[in-house]
Amino acid sequence: MKKILYFSAAWCGPCKTLGPIMESLSGQINYQKINVDTNQDQSIKYGIRNIPALVLLENGEVKDKKVGVLSKDQILNFYNG
């Protein structure tokens, strides 16, 4: 099963741009939003140093990572590989 971990923070400008794009895809992709300020352990676990960041998991394993604002199509391509 595929899942995207979406790392963001309330103070992050680019995250505010990516947030609505991710929300618009909620029926098409499986994702979980993770606040880096309140979930530092997850940020460390997945090596997140810049946000916004997307980590693609497949069967619990990291398959790919992207950093920065992506378009809806780019996210769908990232997810569907």
Regions found by a protein language model. Give the residues of each.
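Short alpha-helical
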Residues: 13, 38-41, 73
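Structural micro-motif
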Residues: 46-55
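Thiol-based oxidoreductase modules, predominantly thioredoxin-like and allied folds used
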Residues: 7, 22, 26-42
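Alpha/beta-hydrolase fold active-site loops
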Residues: 2, 28, 52
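Non-catalytic, surface beta->alpha helical segment in thiol-disulfide oxidoreductase systems
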Residues: 56-81
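Local sequence-structure signature of Cys/Sec-based thiol-disulfide redox active-site neighborhoods
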Residues: 1-25
